[in-house]
A protein has these predicted regions:
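Active-site-proximal, well-structured secondary-structure segments within enzyme catalytic domains
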Residues: 14-194
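A structural signal for the main folded, soluble domain(s) of proteins
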Residues: 1-2, 9
Length: 200
């Protein structure tokens, strides 16, 4: 079968990624190195995207604003704070104070837009992959997670939906009791949803 590229080289320039250390094992991905190197490449691709296809990007942002705005703001804030969890950010941003959040978004608009661009590129590649696999008669099975991560845009943007303490950390955490798999049980650490009558 002919290999298909999903990297959309219209926004990626070879010289921007060919010299990065992605690892040299042909049998296994080195995710540590990929994680460390990807930011520079994605930032360059995002900056080029703004020049090449702004209308498609803007349409994507409008269509997905319900989740994209919070996600991009969260990821930009996380980057600006050196990867620290949101519970360690300054109080105004941690509590999503409207004035402080607006100030951050204005001062870091480039970071926010880059995060939106990365999502746009991902979804464009994902749709290309889905179209290709459908032509090949291959079905992709999705896995819906049952919990969200504590340090996530979901919890940061919607703390009222979770059982959290005053510092934003889980008051109750997900896990399982001891069983045949683990004598000690498992503590996953994911925050539990705050179920109310409106959730049912």
């Amino acid at each position: 079968m002919r290999p298909v590229s999903y990297t959309h080289l219209d926004v990626y320039k070879r010289q921007e990624y060919m010299y990065n250390d992605w690892g040299n094992d042909e049998e296994a991905a080195d995710y540590g190195k990929i994680y460390a190197e990807r930011g520079k490449v994605l930032a360059a691709a995002a900056d080029r995207l703004f020049k090449l296809s702004p209308e498609g990007f803007r349409a994507f942002c409008r269509k997905n604003a319900s989740w994209l705005d919070n996600y991009a703001l969260f990821m930009a804030a996380k980057e600006a704070h050196g990867g620290a969890p949101w519970t360690d950010w300054e109080s105004g941003l941690r509590r999503r104070d409207e004035i402080e959040t607006g100030r951050f978004e204005k001062e870091h608009s480039r970071l926010v837009d880059r995060q939106k661009a990365v999502q746009f590129l991902f979804f464009r590649q994902w749709e290309a992959l889905r179209r290709h696999t459908e032509k090949c008669g291959i079905q992709i099975i999705g896995d819906m997670p049952i919990y969200v991560a504590q340090d996530s845009a979901d919890v940061w943007a919607n703390p009222e939906l979770f059982l959290l303490d005053s510092g934003g950390r889980p008051a109750w955490a997900a896990g399982v009791p001891p069983d045949g798999f683990s004598d000690a049980g498992q503590l996953w650490g994911n925050p539990c949803l705050l179920y109310t009558s409106s959730c049912m």
